[in-house]
Curated annotation (Swiss-Prot):
Source superkingdom: Bacteria
Protein name, entry field: UPF0178 protein BCAH187_A3092
InterPro entries per the UniProt record, alphabetical: UPF0178
HAMAP family for the chain: UPF0178
PANTHER family: UPF0178 PROTEIN YAII
Ranges that cross the membrane: none
Amino acid sequence: MKIYVDADACPVKDVIIFEATKAEIPVTLVTSFSHYSNAEQPKGVETIYVDSGADAADYRIMQLAQKEDLIITQDYGLASLALAKGCIVLHHKGYKYTNDNIEQLLQTRYLSAMVRKSGKRTKGPKPFTAEDKEKFRALFKSFIAR
C-alpha cells in the first residue's frame, strides 16, 4: 500500500505523515508549484509538484495510484475516479468515500454548482475542527493498520 495525498488544501498532512512514517508506509504528497516548500520531509515522504492548473494534482495522483492504495482528498471527482480504480479513498474530515455515497456527493456538488450558476449563493463547508482531525486520525490509523 502507498498513500497519495491531494495536498494543496489538506489540513491533515501532519497526521498523515506522522502516522504513516511510524507505520513505515510511503507517502506521496501531490501539490502545485504555488505551494512549493524547501522543507525537508521525513524518510518515506515524497513531494511531487505539478502545474497550478485545475485538476493537475488529481491527474497526477490517478497516474500513480494502484488498486488498494490509500488516497486522501476532499475532491469528489478524484474520489470517484480513485474508487473506480479500486483505491481506498478518505476525506480529511474523517469519512470514507464508497461506491454507495459518491453518487450522492457528486449529485449534491452538481446541484450546488447549478444554483451558483443561476446567481444564487450556497452554503460553504463547515469549518474544520479539532474533532474532525481526531476523527480522521482514528479512521486513517484503522486503514494503515491492516
